[in-house]
């Protein structure tokens, strides 16, 4: 059905996800069928068949389509003194951090009006946006043509006219769409859900197939509280930043988004899919193999060559964001660095990124675990804060443990961690293992508490650890490592699936024996 000539093949990279509500006086949905140049009109019975297999906009593979999927299967069998009290400086009339319970997103309170977006910290919501220093105005999100309001007709997405019945936030969202001239759009039935990638308090991420061009994408679904203009404004501002970032080898590509207001009240974002997942996922898979006894805990998956390539990809992506767009990521951690089997490193989730004003960002937001000392103390924050986070991430990758110890996500646990970051000595690679002088020096230069003494991104890009592995042969070795990781991830999924099947079978047998 997806292969009918009535479905036009489109390039997803040039996609604009535009939606239009078409509601009658009785509030019922009215179906519309878009006619395209060079295409015949979609027949009503085709649309009915599509509706029959659609369940909450999540479609699953049919047998005929499954044969078309050709994911690269590159399998490979190779294998302290008394601490001082932390003083958090909070400028007057500036946002201040409010730690809320785990069931809620931590926000930044302000004396400004409600229209000023609240900041959602990344440790409990990776999709939050940082506000600019001024209140939201149409100019801050001008030209955001890829965000739209929901489709009332489930089969097509097009630019809607403004409606008086919409909330102010939704109206502002539509204002950003005015002037969209690109006629490209996507049909919802073209997206086929393949499986879940991850889920959290802030939403879910699934792997999906765009059928017309056989493109695999990642689809994020972010629930939004009904008529919550604060959250919507945050997401609009964040997506406006991401949309304006042009494709780059070390930045995840943004394809489009739309706001589904009337059906599930959620924002859906489409972006580039990385088949090896995040560094955090790879680290979790490694730990499961260690627990099974099939991998030695003394032999890490992240050798020096791998660390060099990862560090270069992160630094190059950060440098691009800063030089071209004056953006600081501010949330560098394993879960926000993605890898694919082609050997590409990608930065994602600009959840607390902020466009710089006067080249300095001083708002207290971000993931507290990887937060630099100067941010905790309320000092001015620059791009060197991401360098600190990179150093902590490298230590975690090679050791398998966060260098500053564990903590809980309660306010007391977070405050204890912040005290340790400021008062304890700078993290270092463990002395009970052997690391090269290049690796040790690189980490030491990242994890310097005094920001002025900490190395810059430019300096680290020319560090011996990076330059040591710059060659085509080293690139080939890293791609080989990525393919092995992809194979290990598949193996881990198979083992977990088999264990689940055995558990279900044992449960059934136990229930039968009791009867």
From Swiss-Prot:
UniProtKB keywords: ATP-binding, Kinase, Nucleotide-binding, Pheromone response, Phosphoprotein, Serine/threonine-protein kinase, Transferase
Residue ranges of every copy of the Protein kinase domain listed in the record: 191-466
GO biological process: cell integrity MAPK cascade; invasive growth in response to glucose limitation; MAPK cascade; pheromone response MAPK cascade; pheromone-dependent signal transduction involved in conjugation with cellular fusion; pseudohyphal growth; response to pheromone triggering conjugation with cellular fusion; signal transduction involved in filamentous growth
Catalytic activity: L-seryl-[protein] + ATP = O-phospho-L-seryl-[protein] + ADP + H(+); L-threonyl-[protein] + ATP = O-phospho-L-threonyl-[protein] + ADP + H(+); L-tyrosyl-[protein] + ATP = O-phospho-L-tyrosyl-[protein] + ADP + H(+)
Family annotation (InterPro entries): Byr1-like_cat, Kinase-like_dom_sf, Prot_kinase_dom, Protein_kinase_ATP_BS, Ser/Thr_kinase_AS
Amino acids binding ATP: 197-205, 220
UniProt-listed Pfam families: Pkinase (PF00069)
Annotated protein name in UniProt: Serine/threonine-protein kinase STE7
UniProt-annotated catalytic positions: 331
Misc. remarks from the entry: Present with 672 molecules/cell in log phase SD medium.
Native source species: Saccharomyces cerevisiae (strain ATCC 204508 / S288c) (Baker's yeast)
The gene coding this protein: STE7
GO cellular component, one term: cytoplasm
């Amino acid at each position: 059905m997806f292969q009918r000539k009535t479905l036009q093949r489109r390039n997803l990279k040039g996609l604009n996800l535009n939606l239009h509500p078409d509601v009658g006086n009785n509030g019922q949905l009215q179906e519309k069928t878009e006619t395209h140049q060079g295409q015949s009109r979609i027949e009503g019975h085709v649309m009915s068949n599509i509706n029959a297999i659609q369940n909450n906009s999540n479609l699953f593979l049919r047998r005929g389509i499954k044969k078309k999927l050709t994911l690269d299967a590159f399998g490979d069998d190779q294998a302290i003194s008394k601490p001082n009290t932390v003083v958090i400086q909070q400028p007057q009339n500036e946002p201040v951090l409010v730690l809320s319970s785990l069931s809620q997103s931590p926000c930044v309170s302000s004396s400004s009006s409600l229209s000023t977006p609240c900041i959602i910290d990344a440790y409990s919501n990776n999709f939050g946006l940082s506000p600019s220093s001024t209140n939201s105005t149409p100019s801050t999100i001008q030209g955001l043509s890829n965000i739209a309001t929901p489709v009332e007709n489930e089969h097509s997405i097009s630019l809607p006219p403004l409606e008086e019945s919409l909330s102010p936030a939704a109206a502002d969202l539509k204002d950003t769409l005015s002037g969209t001239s690109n006629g490209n759009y996507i049909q919802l039935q073209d997206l086929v859900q393949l499986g879940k990638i991850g889920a959290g308090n802030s939403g879910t991420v699934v792997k999906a197939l765009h059928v017309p061009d056989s493109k695999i994408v990642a689809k994020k679904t972010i629930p939004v509280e009904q008529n919550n203009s604060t959250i919507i404004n945050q997401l609009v501002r964040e997506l406006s930043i991401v949309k304006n970032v042009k494709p780059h080898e070390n930045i995840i590509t943004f394809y489009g988004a739309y706001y589904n207001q009337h059906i599930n009240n959620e924002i859906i974002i489409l972006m580039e899919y990385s088949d090896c997942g995040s560094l955090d996922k790879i680290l979790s898979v490694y730990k499961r193999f260690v627990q099974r006894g099939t991998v030695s805990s003394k032999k890490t998956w992240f050798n020096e060559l791998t660390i060099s390539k990862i560090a270069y990809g992160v630094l190059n992506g950060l440098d691009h964001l800063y030089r071209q767009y004056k953006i600081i990521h501010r949330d560098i951690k394993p879960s926000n660095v993605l890898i694919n089997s082609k050997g590409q490193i990608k930065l994602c989730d600009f959840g607390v990124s902020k466009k710089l004003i006067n080249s300095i960002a001083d708002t207290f937001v971000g993931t507290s675990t990887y937060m630099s000392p100067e941010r905790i103390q309320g000092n001015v924050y620059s791009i060197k804060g991401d360098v600190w986070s990179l150093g902590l991430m490298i230590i975690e990758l090679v050791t398998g443990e966060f260098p500053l110890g564990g903590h809980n996500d309660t306010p007391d646990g977070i405050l204890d961690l912040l005290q340790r970051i400021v008062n304890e000595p700078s993290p270092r690679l463990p002395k009970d293992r052997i690391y090269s002088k290049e690796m040790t020096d690189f980490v030491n230069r990242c994890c310097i508490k005094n920001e002025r003494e900490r190395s810059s991104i430019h300096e680290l890009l020319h560090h011996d650890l990076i330059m040591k592995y710059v060659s085509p042969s080293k690139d080939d070795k890293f791609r080989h490592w990525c393919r092995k990781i992809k194979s290990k991830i598949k193996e881990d999924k198979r083992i977990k699936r088999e264990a689940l099947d055995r558990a279900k079978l044992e449960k059934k047998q136990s229930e039968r024996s009791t009867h």
